[in-house]
Design a protein with these regions (language model features):
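Structural signature of the two symmetry-related core transmembrane helices
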Residues: 86-100, 182, 307-322
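Cytoplasmic helix-loop-helix junction between adjacent transmembrane helices
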Residues: 114-154, 352-353
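Symmetry-related core transmembrane helices of the 12-TM Major Facilitator Superfamily/SLC fold
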Residues: 176-193, 398-414
């Protein structure tokens, strides 16, 4: 008998700490890949490629969000079929050309193409690191684990946005700011190939602890079978109240992020702020977002998911409205910090709620569907903000997004039920599973 066969798989953060910590580091590198664009690319569009229309400038976010959304869906399906690690490695291979294209792109079309590749890279790598951590920790500390995961990723987004802003102010918008991306891609690929281990077996082990039931039809009859991908899509998008509530909230959350990524830097620069100060503002939002998740992820394990999701969406709406209504570095810095706090309440909690409800046997695909809708928010937000900013004013676009965000929070309040057993009197009801309270 081999050592691997004689050692039973164990769920839990402490039991899998080394591999979990490695995946946190890998996810930080994933975040750094997107962070290299947060400050520089909107300014590159305006200053070097002479794009004046918001709809033209934001095409890179539309390309990124559309491709990442679809890739998320396939990442979940592929990771169930071929394993998590091959999908992770493929994502890093696709990401290697991205910083090189951004350095030397002769036209804006090449920048858009680089973001197509970045969308695939992010969809494969971030999805699989999320799924792998969920596999490893089991159900008890899922929110805490997602908080650490997202804190690492968005902490790296913030640090890289700040660093690239500093570099760009002193030596130019390119190529030097994108040297960081070259280092991130090489290190991420090396760690994933050499040290990351497959975790699909942990999900299969957890699945043996659950009854495999799902809705057979609209009458809710439960049957012991694995649902089809189409059924999982419908459950996560429409039919299951908690899953669908999380999907719409995730979409609106990233609609906000698309606005912050593509519109805010141009608004700040047009107001006369230096590239360095724009970089600071671009970093504050993901920095608070990232650091806050270290607390909010674990908090959702104690007080439940619903309150944090609804409260976070309403906090984001207030912050976006504040940014639209005020002017100046200090006021905008405050708005960015509050926006980051609201996002920190929502981001790890949404993915933890998906993990609460979805059965381990089809959880990766449910995560993929959720992330499809969530990252479609990038594209929808860029299109909406671009059209409104060009037709009216950037302020009109920002106010509209604030209203949509508030409406999303109200939907969560009215439709979602609490999914975490520690915060709910009843046990979690899987789709179609008939559960009685103790």
């Amino acid at each position: 008998m081999t050592a691997a066969a004689s050692t039973p798989l164990r769920l839990g953060l402490r039991e899998n700490l080394a591999q979990f910590s490695l995946l946190v580091g890998v996810n930080a590198l994933v975040g750094g890949m997107i962070g290299q664009e947060r400050t520089v690319l909107p300014l590159l569009a305006r200053n070097e490629f002479r794009l004046t229309a918001f709809t033209a400038t934001l095409t890179f976010i539309v390309a990124f969000g559309s491709v990442k959304a679809v890739t998320n869906f396939f990442a979940g399906t592929l990771s169930d079929r071929v394993g998590r690690k091959p999908v992770l490695v493929a994502g890093w291979l696709i990401g290697i050309p991205v910083p090189l294209l951004l350095m030397w792109a002769p036209t804006w079309g090449w920048v858009v193409f680089a973001n197509v590749l970045l969308g695939i890279n992010q969809g494969f790598t971030w999805s699989t690191t999320v799924i792998m951590k969920i596999d490893l920790v089991g159900p008890q500390r899922r929110g805490f684990a997602m908080g650490i995961n997202e804190a690492a990723g968005y902490g790296a987004v913030a640090a890289t946005a700040l660093a690239t802003g500093y570099i760009a102010e002193h030596v130019g918008l390119r190529p030097q700011p994108f040297f960081l991306g070259v280092a991130y891609a090489g290190l991420g690929l090396g760690l994933s190939v050499l040290f990351v281990r497959e975790t699909r077996g942990h999900a299969q082990h957890e699945a043996t602890l659950h009854s495999l039931k799902t809705a057979h039809a609209s009458d809710g009859e439960a049957v012991d079978r694995l649902p089809s991908t189409k059924e999982i899509f419908m459950l996560t998008t429409f039919r299951e109240k908690a899953l669908s509530s999380c999907s719409q909230a995730g979409l609106v959350n990233n609609l906000n992020d698309g606005l912050a990524w593509g519109v805010f830097p141009i608004v700040f620069a047009n107001a006369g702020l230096s590239i360095g100060r724009v970089g600071i503002l671009a970093a504050i939002y993901p920095a608070v977002w990232g650091a806050g998740q270290l607390y909010t992820g674990g908090l959702s394990d104690r007080i439940g998911r619903k309150r944090l999701i609804a409260g976070g969406m309403l906090t984001q709406a207030a912050a976006i409205g504040w940014i639209a209504a005020t002017h100046g570095f200090t006021q905008w810095a405050l708005g960015a910090a509050v926006l980051g706090a609201g996002t920190a309440m929502v981001y790890p909690t949404l993915i933890a709620a998906i993990g609460d409800v979805a059965h381990p046997a089809w959880r990766a695909r449910a995560v993929g569907v959720y992330r499809l809708w969530r990252d479609a928010g990038f594209a929808i937000g860029a299109i909406l903000a671009g059209i409104l900013a060009d037709a009216f004013t950037p302020a009109a676009a920002i106010w509209t997004v604030a209203a949509i965000t508030a409406a999303s929070g109200i939907v969560v309040i009215g439709r979602m039920y609490e999914t975490h057993p520690a915060a709910s009197r009843a046990q979690i009801h899987l789709p179609g599973e008939h559960v009685t309270t103790a």
